[in-house]
């Protein structure tokens, strides 16, 4: 059986700085991995490559045995979601709006907001946030709750595999 994710000889440079060089990584079904290292060691860069935010300068990525093209849309389509260390949220928007922004499936160009809201309410309940309205402004939440919203966003988008970037920064 093929690994869920296989990265081969991944290299990424930013000008003269080499962030990742020749990195090999394999993730099999049921495994959990942690990338541990000093600030600036290239952990976030490697995750952003897997998520499709950065294209590597060298190497290949396979998901479920198929070589991937790079890009966030491709990663989401293949079930890879990322929870960023810096929130990807717009303060003046609601929880639901922040989660579906740019990602909600649309029929005939329209978002089924009611269905999206119901799915988000179920995810809020799953994360112990049943008292929080999906219509609440995102900036009314504390930092830990906002981090949970980032995880909920990845699950809402159908992420099978989740990349958590410095999640412990917000967990107290």
Language-model segments: which ranges?
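Glycine-rich phosphate-binding loops of nucleotide-dependent enzymes
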Residues: 1-172
